[in-house]
Curated annotation (Swiss-Prot):
Subcellular location: Plastid, Chloroplast
Binding site for Mg(2+): K191, D193, E194
Protein role: RuBisCO catalyzes two reactions: the carboxylation of D-ribulose 1,5-bisphosphate, the primary event in carbon dioxide fixation, as well as the oxidative fragmentation of the pentose substrate in the photorespiration process. Both reactions occur simultaneously and in competition at the same active site.
N6-carboxylysine carried by residues: K191
Organism of this sequence: Garrya elliptica
Record PTM N6,N6,N6-trimethyllysine, positions in chain: K4
Domain of life per record: Eukaryota
Binding-site residues for substrate, renumbered to this chain: N113, T163, K167, R285, H317, S369
Protein's name in the database: Ribulose bisphosphate carboxylase large chain
Main location, first listed in the record: plastid
Length: 459
């Protein structure tokens, strides 16, 4: 036939509505907003082309390979209800386009280039279906939910955490003191803030030592296993690993990483180290809102959550749901299930565009954190269930009597909610009543309830 130079429409090659998706394909759902005058088929095909084998003009080297084998295909387009000129474009990518076990490569391919494309006004990646064959190339979370419970010997309830505040400015010794008080009072974990790395007022090594001392002391006094998320995030991968190694030498149970600012490559290395060395890995999602907050451009958090489960982490922050809109609650619970469960059915009402089978990849505990306090406990227990970490920063340290009583208040509230639920009571309806009853035999909880009573909780 010979080589025919020139520019041709993407849709001639990359829009294939008759394509039957394969079990090994990576499937993507994009929310596409084309520029005025660009037909949706062309926009969808452009996304498929630019994120796989295509470029803007025909090149003679196309003849040296089999495009049919390697090209991404836009196989379905549907208009978004209630939005003008916005479509969901479904794209299938052949498995061979991706390096095994590399979240970094997967993202570079799928979202690396196409988001700046001129034919599109905006583009958002809403969901990915990761095929079983690709899932199996990832180690995933270092340990997962069941192994974590066995390590901690804690069952049948959510775990409790607290971020140490003020996040910047405390000396290492005072920081360790705050950690000890919270753990001693009844929390399971305390946490380094995401921006606590190694600053002039508190170098990482000093912090690690004082926190380890706090953990050991609290464990000895309570007879429970305790942890503090030691943030190993650093300016280089080597420095990050050095901090993780030191944490292991101290014998602490868990370290922490900011996976978006630190990057997927660093995160996956750390996750492998954590599995090999028995460390749990807590993941903070600093920077996520830069990527996921705009509703028609960027990447939805459920995709970032799936990517984290592949890269590896035992906990990840996932919003609180509390006091938010009803719809957001369903969407949040959708990606919470994607983090924890082994098999998730497609359910558009919860934002889940594809059925996802994780084939026994360990699950991740969702962490609810941010602006929550004791009055929220019944709702949180009901919404998140046992497999979660509930984190109260100000809701612990803001207690009028101090950190330890703040921790006591949270633990009492949690145990009361779990007991009430196990007795068959309705937490959504009777939540406030359950907390009030518990106040009668816990002055610490009563004091906490008094401080935050004005912050109402609407279901």
């Amino acid at each position: 036939v010979g080589f025919k130079a020139g520019v041709k429409d993407y849709k001639l090659t990359y829009y294939t509505p008759d394509y039957e998706t394969k079990d090994t394909d990576i499937l993507a759902a994009f929310r596409v907003t084309p520029q005025p005058g660009v037909p949706p088929e062309e926009a969808g095909a452009a996304v498929a082309a630019e994120s796989s084998t295509g470029t803007w003009t025909t090149v003679w080297t196309d003849g040296l390979t089999s495009l049919d084998r390697y090209k991404g295909r836009c196989y379905h387009i549907e208009p978004v209800v209630g939005e003008e000129n916005q479509y969901i474009a479904y794209v299938a990518y052949p498995l061979d386009l991706f390096e095994e076990g590399s979240v970094t490569n997967m993202f570079t391919s799928i979202v690396g280039n196409v988001f700046g494309f001129k034919a599109l006004r905006a583009l958002r990646l809403e969901d990915l279906r990761i095929p079983v064959a690709y899932v199996k190339t990832f180690q995933g979370p270092p340990h997962g939910i069941q192994v974590e419970r066995d390590k901690l010997n804690k069952y049948g309830r959510p775990l409790l955490g607290c971020t140490i505040k003020p996040k910047l400015g405390l000396s290492a010794k005072n920081y360790g003191r705050a950690v000890y008080e919270c753990l001693r009072g009844g929390l399971d974990f305390t946490k380094d803030d995401e921006n606590v790395n190694s600053q002039p007022f508190m170098r990482w090594r000093d912090r690690f030592l004082f926190c380890a001392e706090a953990i050991n002391k609290a464990q000895a006094e309570t007879g429970e296993i305790k942890g503090h998320y030691l943030n190993a995030t650093a300016g280089t991968c080597e420095e990050m690993m050095k901090r993780a190694v030191f944490a292991r030498e101290l014998g602490v149970p868990i370290v922490m990483h900011d996976y978006l600012t630190g990057g997927f490559t660093a995160n996956t290395s750390l996750a492998h180290y954590c599995r090999d060395n028995g460390l749990l890995l807590h993941i903070h999602r600093a920077m996520h809102a830069v990527i996921d907050r705009q509703k028609n451009h960027g990447i939805h958090f459920r995709v970032l959550a799936k990517a984290l489960r592949m890269s590896g982490g035992d906990h990840i922050h996932a919003g609180t749901v509390v006091g938010k809109l009803e719809g957001e609650r369903e969407i949040t619970l959708g990606f919470v299930d994607l983090l924890r469960d082994d098999f998730i059915e497609k359910d558009r009402s919860r934002g889940i565009y594809f059925t996802q089978d994780w084939v026994s990849l360990p699950g991740v505990l969702p962490v609810a954190s941010g602006g929550i306090h004791v009055w929220h406990m019944p709702a949180l227990t009901e919404i998140f269930g046992d497999d979660s970490v509930l984190q109260f920063g100000g809701g612990t340290l803001g207690h009028p009597w101090g950190n330890a009583p703040g921790a006591v208040a949270n633990r009492v509230a949690l145990e009361a909610c779990v007991q009430a639920r196990n007795e068959g009571r309705d937490l959504a309806r009777e939540g406030n009543e359950i907390i009030r009853e518990a106040c009668k035999w816990s002055p610490e909880l009563a004091a906490a309830c008094e401080v935050w009573k004005a912050i109402k909780f609407e279901f």
